[in-house]
Amino acid sequence: PDSLHELLYGKDNAATDDVHIRLNSYGGSCNAATRMFDDIRAYPGSVKITVSGTAASAATVLCMAADRLEMTPGSLFMIHDPSTVAYGNERDMDEAKAVLRACKESILNMYGTRIRISRDDAADMMMKTSWMDANEAFEKGFVDGVTETPAKLPTDSAGHKVSLDTAK
């Protein structure tokens, strides 16, 4: 599969099968991560995500939608305030700032579906840019557990290898 949506809802998947995704990503667009979050949440089967390497920035957002979220012991999890590049006049800068504020609130809403720390604490961690090892991410409720490094890459029901690795 070329995309998460295709993995979950493509012709080779029964759209009810349990899915296990091994994730390694430095992130990307807030909007794309929100779409992936929504796709995972709407999926009728169980979705397990194992962070193997790094889940950073927008990649942490889609992780929040998993039914089960684990990290391997050597993996890292990073949250930070959203950022952008803006060009234009004062009004354009105000608009860019408003979009960033709204994006942060949206991310905090999605974090709030899982984390065991307060929204204010999560916002403070984002403002500071916070890197967490697997144990700290577990303690703060970002992940459900720390797991051993898988010996084999998981496969879906059609036998496809399932790995989202954008950190190449």
PLM regions and their residue ranges:
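N-terminal organellar transit peptides
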Residues: 1-60, 65-168
